[in-house]
Design a protein with these regions (language model features):
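Non-heme Fe(II)/2-oxoglutarate
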Residues: 1-74, 82-84
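A general secondary-structure signal for short beta-strands and their flanking turns/coil
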Residues: 9-11, 98-100, 155
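Flexible, glycine- and charge-enriched loops at secondary-structure boundaries
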Residues: 45, 125-128, 156
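Catalytic core of non-heme Fe(II) oxygenases with the double-stranded beta-helix
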Residues: 69, 74-145, 149
Length: 157
């Protein structure tokens, strides 16, 4: 008897453990994010972004054996108790040019969660909740719909 896995939904998550002396200045990253949103411009290149991007791409390549290529870079800020609209980072009519994965990173977050929806064969409508905390990443297939929730009532996330 043999078994062949035809499809799987892989989720990758964990802390960004930068080497000593190469820590990411999340305040600078947050400032760049806010400036890009206020000015309605693309997320700017910065030393912090390059360090984070390089770490994540190399970590995924070494640990999981595949390479990531950036398609689109953006950041969001959520008001207290705000829940995002349903997010899906693919274009259903142009799957060839859509990203394979969505990667979220917690820049300066407090009590934030991500709900990722998926189907497991006949069991549709399943979801998985995971906390998004400071300096943590979550990566999953871009074909999965997700929500981001700012659970606390005091500040922006």
């Amino acid at each position: 008897m043999e078994k062949k896995v035809l499809a799987e939904i892989a989720l990758y998550y964990g802390d960004v453990a930068m080497p000593k002396g190469f820590e990411i200045n999340r305040d600078k990253l947050q400032s760049d994010l806010l400036k890009s949103q206020i000015n309605n411009k693309e997320f700017p290149y910065s030393r912090e972004w390059d360090m984070l991007n390089t770490y994540l791409r190399e970590h995924i390549n070494v640990e999981h054996g595949f390479q990531l290529i950036n398609k689109k870079i953006w950041g969001n800020v959520y008001k207290p108790k705000e829940i995002s609209v349903p997010l899906l980072n693919i274009d259903p009519v142009d799957l060839r040019n859509s990203p394979d994965y969505t990667l979220l990173y917690g820049v300066n977050v407090k009590d934030c969660s991500v709900k990722i929806h998926y189907a497991a064969n006949r069991r549709a409508g399943r979801s998985w909740d995971i906390a998004l905390t400071n300096n943590k990443f979550i990566m999953f297939p871009s074909t999965q719909m997700y929500y981001i929730t700012n659970n606390q009532k005091d500040s922006l996330n």
